[in-house]
């Protein structure tokens, strides 16, 4: 392509971009569409030298239009710090699926007790941040006291040497949970060993299947830092997981996979068909490492499947110290 024509093309697009950014209208994408139609496209010879193509214009303009389009679209809950709105019964985790309830009970889900929302976020894959599912992490209402009973001043001075005496025990514990990945893993694992019951609600934002959901769980569990020290025991647990997750077929967007961590460390899997509002208990994994490693990965460490869910959950846990 001729350098002069390329330069003119880019200048025209730059002028269009600048004009739309300065437009009093809040929708820069609409501004771009109006102005781009008035720009006269320049023809460029293709490789055959016999056919003319508009592809350079379309390539550059598509990139520009895409950036303006996504600039105007609201982003839901990607970096929220005010995680839990007051006076509501649910919260939007992703705009493409139903809101998540702040409370889950045995009246509306196949669970053993009442759970309160602890943290939430989205699961992304690849560097393009391709969204896979919305995730809600819940803590059993009757187990909230286990947080302060386990992570207290005695625990702090027993296991950690780098305590800042100018800070309160709660401030020191909060610092370790939020800023030290290795120590946060130890603290969360100790919390889970206390018998703390938890629940994960996974809601796909696009159609998927049970195989992909199971593979995702196995990958998450396998990234726990203590896997190498527990290979044989964990292998048996993953075999149990495969049996409990034996259902095949598709999972529609907005259906739910409910994973409940029971007091004895077992995991119960349930499936919610949101279209027909039907529930199915799929199976139970009794191997305690599977549940412990899964929820530990959700709550801490470098390789959490949803950093936003981890952050909001840890922030909430700190308020319970």
From Swiss-Prot:
InterPro entries: Chalcone_isomerase (IPR016087), Chalcone_isomerase_3-sand (IPR016088), Chalcone_isomerase_sf (IPR036298)
Classification via Pfam families: Chalcone_2
SUPFAM superfamilies assigned: Chalcone isomerase (SSF54626)
Record note on disruption phenotype: Increases frequency of mitochondrial genome loss.
Mitochondrion among keywords: yes
Keywords: Mitochondrion, Transit peptide
Molecular-function annotations in GO: heme binding; intramolecular lyase activity
Principal location class: mitochondrion
Presequence positions on this chain: 1-72
Localization annotation: Mitochondrion
Gene3D superfamilies for this protein: 3.50.70.10
GO cellular component, one term: mitochondrial inner membrane
Note: Present with 1350 molecules/cell in log phase SD medium.
Assigned protein family: Belongs to the AIM18/AIM46 family.
Protein name per Swiss-Prot or TrEMBL: Altered inheritance of mitochondria protein 18, mitochondrial
Annotated source species: Saccharomyces cerevisiae (strain ATCC 204508 / S288c) (Baker's yeast)
Gene: AIM18
């Amino acid at each position: 392509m001729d350098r002069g024509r390329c330069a003119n093309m880019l200048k025209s697009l730059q002028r269009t971009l600048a004009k739309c950014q300065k437009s009093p209208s809040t929708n820069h994408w609409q501004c771009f569409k109006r102005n781009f139609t008035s720009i006269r496209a320049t023809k460029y010879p293709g490789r055959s030298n016999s056919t003319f193509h508009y592809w350079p214009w379309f390539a550059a303009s598509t990139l520009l239009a895409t950036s303006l389009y996504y600039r105007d679209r609201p982003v839901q809950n990607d970096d929220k710090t005010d995680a839990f709105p007051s006076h509501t019964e649910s919260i939007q985790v992703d705009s493409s699926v139903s809101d998540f309830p702040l409370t889950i009970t045995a009246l509306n889900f196949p669970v053993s007790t009442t759970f309160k929302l602890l943290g939430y976020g989205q699961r992304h894959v690849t560097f393009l941040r391709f969204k896979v599912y919305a995730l809600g992490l819940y803590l059993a209402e009757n187990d909230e006291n286990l947080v302060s009973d386990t992570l207290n001043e005695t625990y702090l001075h027993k296991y950690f040497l780098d305590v800042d005496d100018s800070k309160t025990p709660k401030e020191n514990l909060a610092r370790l949970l939020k800023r030290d990945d290795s120590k946060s893993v130890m603290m969360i694992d100790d919390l889970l060993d206390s018998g703390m019951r938890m629940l994960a609600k996974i809601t796909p934002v696009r159609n998927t299947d049970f195989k992909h959901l199971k593979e995702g769980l196995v990958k998450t569990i396998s990234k726990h830092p203590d896997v190498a020290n527990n290979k044989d025991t964990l292998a048996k647990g993953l075999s149990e997981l495969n049996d409990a997750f034996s259902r095949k077929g598709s999972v529609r967007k907005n259906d739910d996979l409910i994973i409940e961590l029971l007091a004895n460390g077992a995991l119960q899997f349930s499936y919610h068909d949101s279209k027909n509002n039907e529930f199915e208990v799929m199976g139970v994994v009794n191997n305690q490492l599977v549940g412990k490693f899964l929820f530990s990965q959700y709550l801490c460490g470098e390789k959490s499947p949803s950093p936003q869910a981890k952050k909001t959950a840890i922030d909430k846990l700190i308020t319970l110290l």
